[in-house]
């Protein structure tokens, strides 16, 4: 059995296969998943799992060079943004896009991880870095 916090097989596989510059999106329950992009659906009920818990576990395994957020998140300030601020040392450089442009970016993702989060704009695109 794995010794690290991430136990989900599909998510472990995607992270293990990511290279420098690859994108992994963690999204709320309402974020659309573009056709052709793998969906890793963790949502079981509204609020479970929450965005922050999934982000913390993903960051235990993924080296992140930069991250992208929707500009609209700044106006709503969901709990997700509070957690992102807390973890900013593990997230690299920050970029902002409109929510519509964020959805366009998600077309390039290796996968979209759907959480049970129901706070608006609780989405992040993680761009993989290198450990050397």
Curated annotation (Swiss-Prot):
Q: Catalysed reaction per UniProt?
A: beta-D-ribopyranose = beta-D-ribofuranose
Q: Could you tell me what this protein does?
A: Catalyzes the interconversion of beta-pyran and beta-furan forms of D-ribose.
Task: Enumerate the UniProt keywords alphabetically.
Answer: Carbohydrate metabolism, Cytoplasm, Isomerase
The record's subcellular locations are: Cytoplasm
Give one GO molecular function term: D-ribose pyranase activity
* This protein's GO CC annotations: cytosol
Source lineage = Bacteria, Pseudomonadati, Pseudomonadota, Gammaproteobacteria, Pseudomonadales
Family stated for the protein in its record: Belongs to the RbsD / FucU family. RbsD subfamily.
Q: What's the protein called, per UniProt? A: D-ribose pyranase
